[in-house]
Amino acid sequence: AASASRVHKEMTKNKPTHNAKESYNYFLATIFPHDEMQIMGYNRVVKDLCGLSDEQFISKLKRNFDIQKLSNKRSPKERFSFTMLLGNCWYCLTAKQQIIKEDSVLRLDASILQHHILEPILKIEDPRTDKRIDFVGGIRGLDELERRCSSDAKVAFALYPVSIEDLLR
């Protein structure tokens, strides 16, 4: 909606004969009941560990996460946990209670990942502009994370999908 608003503003500025009937005056929207919606996970791959070895990286993660090595790949099973692919091994990272905030935005798994892994450990301050991180839609599955980690990425994080209720808060 914000980008549509910017387009509208730019178009009206450049058209002195604006009459409010142009197509850029309209924004298509649709409404669905929240209980009929599903949000898929939105995963991340990172190209390097910011100079850390795998062992150093895992050691830093242990400050804020309980870590369990998995025998097989799997998606996270609940909020406040991620699955991580590092060095051909899958891990489950579960956030320790001390980092789970009451604030509805800071409680989101994406915020926990950003504030406790990406920014402080991997030095990714702005994931929208940093060239070292990429986003992988959940529809592409864990196989895509494995493919990326065998080609151009060092570590991958699979996130539990945010609920509609959390999104609306």
Regions inferred by a protein language model and the residue ranges of each:
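Surface-exposed, charge/polar-rich loops and edge strands
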Residues: 2-169
